[in-house]
Amino acid sequence: MTNIRKTHPLMKIMNSSFIDLPAPSNISSWWNFGSLLGACLAIQIITGLFLAMHYTADTATAFSSVTHICRDVNQGWIIRYLHANGASMFFLCLFLHVGRGVYYGSFTLYETWNIGIILLFTVMATAFMGYVLPWGQMSFWGATVITNLLSAIPYIGTDLVEWIWGGFSVDKATLTRFFAFHFILPFIISALVLVHLLFLHETGSNNPLGTSSESDKIPFHPYYTIKDLLGLMFLLLTLTILVLFSPDLLGDPDNYMPANPLSTPPHIKPEWYFLFAYAILRSIPNKLGGVLALIMSILILAIIPVLQTAKQRTMMFRPLSQIMFWILTADLFTLTWIGGQPVEHPFVTIGQVASILYFSLILIIMPTVSLIENKMLKW
């Protein structure tokens, strides 16, 4: 008798996606982050659902409802901190996942890559709106500063900002709609993830060598399910240590003060995972230019496949490109650091140099280095 997982209409889909899926035999731990992102999304949806049961999206009670969750709800504090720090783990895995894609040339799977970029934007939008919900000082001022950037759009800018705010400032209407969007977007993300996987399974996974895996495939289960479980254990261990020992390590102390429109915090800054983009935004004196640079800092990922000049898919055997890649990584760390610093000398100059280097590396230096490597390899 045929196994039910191979005949049942629904289980057949699951089987071909996660059990009998032919996978390259040589993919490394860098390929773990896809499943870890799925786990992060599940954690965020479950904890978020429980938080939504006790949260009130109203300017008068939002801050106290979060306090109520932490103090009065059974295990409320751990649900709240799992959700807050789960977002950090989510972005950590996202950045590593994208970095792996750039290093090993996974961007040549165009459809998967482009859906991935849409996913990145959607997750960033969700995280931004979620940060506004506790209605602390940094929530309020972060929302004010970032939404206000849209006023840089010529002609329709001011109207657009007031339309998003639902009034003439960030207020009750803004909080209510941000809560509604923050609730619905993770489900849209889940649907996009399925499309992402659909396109991935059309072509099959890339591998560290960048060569075709057609002649050497192994079943996903048990080989990669056990490998993914190990990665999941490390993820949960890190998240648990963070939540139980220093839950506020990655947060901002200003957010423990209720939102006050009459008092501006000394340094308005987003969560750590947006700091690199925030640094790029601040490094350009012109408002519209800054907004365009901010969008391009992520959207530049969509141009990477067009700029691919190398004859080899991965950077595994291209030492010069590897050096450029790690300089780019160091540059992103620098931008993240600068984004958290006040707007004063020498941080402004460092930020501007790092921003120019970021775009130069991706648009000019790395494609040129790839061409040089082609010449060296007589290709």
From Swiss-Prot:
Residue sites binding heme b b562 per the record: H83, H182
GO process annotations (BP): mitochondrial electron transport, ubiquinol to cytochrome c
Binding annotation for heme b b566: H97, H196
GO cellular component: mitochondrial inner membrane; respiratory chain complex III
GO MF annotation list: metal ion binding; ubiquinol-cytochrome-c reductase activity
Binding site for a ubiquinone: H201
Annotated PANTHER family: CYTOCHROME B (PTHR19271:SF16)
UniProt-recorded name of the protein: Cytochrome b
